[in-house]
A protein has these predicted regions:
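S-adenosyl-L-methionine
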Residues: 233-309
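Short, well-ordered loop/turn elements at secondary-structure boundaries
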Residues: 24-25, 134-137, 303
């Protein structure tokens, strides 16, 4: 269905790590605003750029898990997922950024034994069995975040894949989110055997859901912006004229001061006030251009990231 006739549409390929998500995740983000909403464009509800966060900042506060099968006493989702014990030697000596395939001891290179013959695993992707960096942005979370043979899954220090809780934090899923009808407090009160049974049943579903997810922090930003622009009363021409009269904005110095210091009105409203405060607007055609019209013009322009101003 072609929605271009009904919506102003903005689409961008972005890495969500630049917009507040704690891990790298490149996706195409598409936002549409109905054309009958004249003063709101997709740019008004697009998420804001934010500084990147390192993996240490995101999960560094969680306790280390050294023992295979260990489950944090206070958090059932912070767990050391079990794997074949022989695989621990493959990753135990590698440093941040290194892969098990970098081991100089051939016995520590990922392999299987078939009919008594050692068969080394294929190194199709350089990010398999790779220990992650503490002080870089967390990697993209994939569906198979439960195994070391997947992409970028090995903890920076511990000899394990990231726990469910760590993956949740990297995907900006709130700690209060419930994966089960069983209350979190009750899950933590289970015996170790009961916790193991619960995780055996639910862990893969949780991990795959996280691997397929879109970071919640991105759509929380979009939703909050939509709520703000839709709930804010529309500034009428009469309202704008009242502000101009009360603040004496026909004086250019007063007008500039008002625009620079006022946080109550968005750009479109300030532009409308500036136009009406300009007594000479008919002489020099200094008219306000509606936001949807501006968007229609700029949306046809090429990306400017390769251009530089001298």
């Amino acid at each position: 269905m072609n929605l271009g006739g009904l919506y102003n549409i903005l689409y961008k390929v972005v890495n969500f790590k630049d917009y507040g998500n704690p891990s790298s995740r490149t996706r195409t983000l598409v936002i549409g605003v109905r054309k009958d909403i004249k003063e709101i464009t997709p740019c008004d509800v697009f998420p804001d750029k934010q500084p990147e966060r390192t993996l240490r900042e995101v999960i560094g506060h969680l306790p280390s898990l050294k023992k295979m099968g260990e489950i944090s006493e206070n958090d059932i989702y912070h767990n050391f997922r079990k794997y074949n014990p022989k695989m621990e030697a493959w990753i135990s000596d590698i440093k941040e950024g290194q892969s098990a395939f970098d081991n100089t001891d051939i016995n520590r290179i990922p392999h299987t034994v078939k009919n008594g013959v050692v068969v080394y695993n294929a190194q199709k992707n350089g990010d398999k069995y790779t220990r992650q960096y503490w002080d870089k942005v967390a990697p993209c979370i994939h569906t198979r975040n439960d195994i070391m043979a997947s992409q970028n899954t090995v903890h920076p220090v511990d000899n394990r894949v990231f726990s469910i809780r760590e993956v949740m934090l990297m995907m900006s899923v709130p700690e209060s989110f419930n994966w089960s009808d069983i209350p979190f407090e009750k899950l933590n009160a289970l015996t170790p055997k009961e916790k193991e049974a619960f995780l055996k049943k639910e862990e893969m579903n949780i991990r795959q859901t996280l691997g397929e997810a879109v970071p919640t922090i991105i759509f929380r930003q979009i939703a909050n912006k939509i709520r703000r622009v839709l709930c804010k009363p529309t500034l009428t021409e009469q309202d704008a004229k009242g502000i101009i009269e009360r603040r004496k904005l026909t004086d250019i110095d007063n007008l500039l001061r008002f625009i620079r210091t006022n946080n109550s009105y968005k750009f479109a409203e300030l532009s409308k006030i500036a136009e009406l405060a300009n007594a000479q607007r008919e002489n020099n055609a200094a008219y306000y251009t509606r936001q949807d019209t501006c968007f229609t013009i700029i949306s046809k322009l090429p990306e400017a990231k390769e251009y530089h101003l001298d």
